[in-house]
Amino acid sequence: MAYHTRVPDVLGMGLLLDNAAPWMGLAVPALLLLALASRSRTSLAVLLVPTLTWLFIFGPAIVPLSWSAPQPGAHTLALSSQNIKAGTGAAAQSALELAADGSDVIALQELDAGSAQRVTAALEEDYPHHFVVGTVGVWSKYPLSNSRSLELGLGWKRALSTQVDTEYGSLRLYVIHAASARPNDHVDRDEMLVQLASAVRSDPHENMVAVGDFNATSTDRAFKKISTILEEPNQDDGLLGFTWPRSPFAMMRLDHVLVRGLEVTSNTNVEAGLSDHFAVRAVLNLPGK
């Protein structure tokens, strides 16, 4: 549990252990029942080791953000992101539901043919600014500038960066749809995360947000490349905020909101459209002039 990232990634074992790490805590109740059945004080004492280990590793991440979140400032920005699932035909539905939830900026991934145009048409009155690259796009109430596509080591474009310019300050936004990760095939995903971390590290903007489907959990060793330079806020109500699959129940957090230089007053998962991913939604205090 504590050293899963040190296990060599042979035959995909590293990837599997990394992503299963939070669930290893489920062994503790089973072990507790066995210890109680045996009436062994030694067994109960030994059980403290995995219990305390799990709490040490994951305890800080499950504390509700609402316990310590900064107060919303005079000017905030609500940002939502979702992998809308290609082939559902519900990209515009997702976008409209996220808009109705009060989002100022909406980032979507896994856009397929024609879906970006349908989203733009659905949102054009309230979100006149947009930038789309390949399968990812951003729609904003605020002007966008310095927008560019990002290949991130691949031969096709699944990421972008843009600057969101508000009256109360600007922020640099990165949107990514990382390549899929399977036990025997996650090289492209790993390379995209390395390249994204490099782009973020060299970006001089003080205020930054990276969102999207990273196809990596927070315990994935490849995700550490980016999570060590950007911060992921806890969930409003605590726990680990699993986003996939949406049904029958979520088991992994593949979709993230990562920030630098900005206060996050809220961070939640929301349902939208027909996707198999929950959307992620964060509210940020704008930096001011």
What residue spans do the PLM features occupy?
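N-terminal, active-site-proximal structural segment of metallo-dependent hydrolase catalytic domains
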Residues: 1-121, 288
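Soluble catalytic domains of enzymes that build or remodel membrane lipids, polysaccharides, and related
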Residues: 75, 79, 85-99, 110-289
